[in-house]
């Protein structure tokens, strides 16, 4: 088994800290800021930092306000002295955000760079509801169907652009007060140049990796390149409903060996008996171990579980 023969370091993500009310003073910087990409004439000097929304992976996400329009945004700032891996992830995320324009993908309003200090900032729409991570166990099937439809439309859009997300999980799905859900965090995503490109590398969050991404040789290296996103999506849907990570008993903390065995050798998790037949079937279509039999995003959008939510 590929992953057993060559154990890779897991890409673990730290949870974002609680939203802070700490205010920032607005001081001018001696380093010149260059607008790499933007819209609506927004520049970095137009923005006032309000508080920290979160930090991790070498960067800080601020809640900011436009000084003239009072519009609220999220500003992700990364310093130039970060690890080269994070630098590549940032470049990849910037490239994908430049290419995408969908109501189901977080919108980029501008990219600013301070060449002298090597600082890069990405201005994105502000999602005031946080992430889906906070909703685990408190989501009804009806509400889950509404979320699923939006996420699948986002995945269908990305896959049509030959973009594989590779880290679909509750923490990377943003929510606003209108119950709109948008896909975010493209640091480990991949743009496929050729149809035969492989994307089964060990990146992202291992808990949500599909069987073929743990062991690419199990499918002879010919697995559906987009199917890993669907597996992650299916696990996430089940997790939001039952309130805990579905591959392990409630309260058990996952480790590499346990996860690998559960994903590669265990049976896929199923929805509880009390769930509707439509939802149970929906989850089963997402969590088929054979990636060639796993449903695609467009196919899942036509599933009876979502047709009930018109």
UniProtKB/Swiss-Prot annotation:
Phenotype of null mutants: Broad spectrum of moderate ethylene-insensitive phenotypes. Reduced salt sensitivity. Delayed senescence phenotype.
Stored Gene3D superfamilies: Phosphorylase Kinase, domain 1, Transferase(Phosphotransferase) domain 1
EC number: 2.7.12.2
Induction and repression of expression: Up-regulated during leaf senescence. By Alternaria brassicae pathogen infection.
Catalysed transformations (reactions): L-seryl-[protein] + ATP = O-phospho-L-seryl-[protein] + ADP + H(+); L-threonyl-[protein] + ATP = O-phospho-L-threonyl-[protein] + ADP + H(+); L-tyrosyl-[protein] + ATP = O-phospho-L-tyrosyl-[protein] + ADP + H(+)
Entry function: MKK9-MPK3/MPK6 module phosphorylates and activates EIN3, leading to the promotion of EIN3-mediated transcription in ethylene signaling. Autophosphorylates and also phosphorylates MPK3 and MPK6. Plays an important role in ethylene and camalexin biosynthesis and in salt stress response. MKK9-MPK6 module positively regulates leaf senescence.
Residues where Phosphothreonine is found: 205
BP GO annotations: camalexin biosynthetic process; cellular response to hypoxia; ethylene biosynthetic process; ethylene-activated signaling pathway; leaf senescence; pollen-pistil interaction; positive regulation of DNA-templated transcription; protein autophosphorylation
Cellular localization per UniProt: Cytoplasm; Nucleus
Modified residues (Phosphoserine): 195, 201
Active site, renumbered: 167 (proton acceptor)
An example Gene Ontology CC term for this record: cytoplasm
Protein name as annotated: Mitogen-activated protein kinase kinase 9
Domain Protein kinase as annotated: residue spans: 47-306
Upper classification of the organism: Eukaryota, Viridiplantae, Streptophyta, Embryophyta, Tracheophyta
